[in-house]
């Protein structure tokens, strides 16, 4: 009976989430009461269902405007910014899936840095992870979602890394330059990068980090010297030649999930290096918590072994000024812990 109730509970929980989006309060209340009646007598006696009840209550915290309380004068490079690695990759199977929630949900959760991988599909740029098309387009879905969010929450700023995932560079550049040159979007872009950019400079706007050349008059910064599968110093270059430097950690390829401890170590070292920068420093920090060790060390395997230990370490050390941190499965328990810590650490930002 307990097992059957557990299955039924999960079905009702899924229906509740769907109903909250589609129907009115009355239906939601009915479903909620039903779930409560199903779980109340069982949670007290069955530890397995007790865990299920706890998980049902453990919803993702919504932080749609957490930057609002931060001072305008705070340099962007001194903010701990949670990001999602391969932000649009919710399809493609265990080997390619890196997120469990879509980009609008990530925005509401408090994610402020996005890793967008694009490839020409038809006459538009589709979002891909390797060969897996994610059934969304940059022009139709992703960029409009960013703009709409900033219109709703103008206190926020977004950092968007753009990368050509496949196809020809000329196709990528041609299509991307059209959207980035659109007059209707110009006021939502940070047009010129400076290492000393403040939150006031960027509120209500997107700061682009270009990993591939798209256009000469690009908004944001070009990433120069991004070494594959390594930790290095990265140059962030404005179109007029003005430069900044970032501590970059992007070591993603491992033999298997058994090497997750190594990944934790390199991430912590990069974040702590950024955190230890002098108050006057305008050096940026970019850390990718994501990794794979295929075939068995999938992104989810690594996320489960890496996200929480890093969050726990940062909490223990009370680390601040952590820089931009790209995370797999931001809505899962370990990912949520890391996202929440990074956001909350800004209360005492230098």
Question: Residue ranges of each PLM-predicted region?
Answer:
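Short, Lys/Arg-enriched N-terminal segments with co-localized hydrophobic residues
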Residues: 1-19
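Bacterial N-terminal signal peptides that target proteins for export
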Residues: 21-29
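Bacterial N-terminal signal peptides
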Residues: 29-39
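Long, acidic (Asp/Glu-rich), low-complexity accessory segments flanking structured domains
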Residues: 45-111, 122-152, 157, 285-350
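Conserved, mostly hydrophobic/aromatic
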Residues: 117, 160, 208, 325
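Active-site groove signature of glycoside hydrolases
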Residues: 156-166
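Acidic, His- and aromatic-enriched active-site or binding-groove loops in soluble protein domains
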Residues: 180-194
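C-terminal active-site rim and adjoining tail of enzyme catalytic domains
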Residues: 209-350
């Amino acid at each position: 009976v307990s097992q059957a109730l557990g299955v039924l509970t999960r079905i009702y929980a899924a229906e509740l989430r769907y109903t909250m989006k589609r129907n009115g309060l009355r239906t939601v209340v009915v479903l909620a009461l039903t779930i409560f009646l199903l779980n109340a007598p069982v949670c007290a006696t069955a530890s397995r269902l007790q865990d299920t009840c706890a998980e049902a209550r453990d919803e993702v915290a919504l932080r749609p405007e957490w930057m609002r309380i931060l001072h305008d004068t705070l340099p962007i490079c001194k903010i701990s910014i949670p990001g999602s690695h391969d932000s649009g990759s919710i399809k493609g199977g265990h080997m390619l899936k890196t997120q469990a929630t879509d980009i609008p949900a990530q925005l509401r959760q408090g994610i402020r840095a996005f890793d967008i991988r694009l490839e020409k599909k038809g006459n538009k740029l589709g979002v891909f992870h390797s060969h897996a098309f994610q059934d969304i387009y940059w022009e139709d879905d992703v960029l409009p979602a960013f703009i709409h969010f900033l219109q709703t929450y103008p206190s926020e700023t977004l950092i968007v890394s753009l990368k050509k995932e496949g196809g020809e560079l000329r196709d990528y550049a041609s299509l991307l330059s059209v959207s980035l040159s659109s007059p209707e979007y110009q006021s939502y872009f940070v047009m010129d990068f400076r290492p000393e950019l403040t939150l006031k400079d960027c509120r209500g706007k997107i700061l682009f980090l270009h990993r591939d050349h798209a256009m000469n008059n690009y908004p944001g910064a070009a990433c120069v010297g991004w070494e594959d599968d390594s930790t290095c110093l990265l140059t962030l270059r404005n179109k007029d030649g003005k430069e900044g430097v970032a501590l970059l950690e992007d070591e993603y390829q491992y033999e298997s999930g058994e090497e997750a401890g190594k990944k934790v170590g390199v991430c912590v070292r990069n974040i702590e290096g950024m955190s230890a920068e002098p108050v006057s420093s305008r050096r940026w920090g970019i850390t990718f918590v994501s990794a794979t060790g295929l075939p068995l060390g999938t992104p989810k395997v690594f996320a489960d072994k890496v996200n929480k230990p890093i969050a726990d370490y940062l909490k223990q050390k009370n680390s601040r000024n952590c820089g931009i941190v790209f995370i797999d499965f931001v809505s899962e328990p370990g990912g949520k812990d890391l996202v929440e810590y990074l956001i909350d650490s800004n209360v005492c930002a230098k």
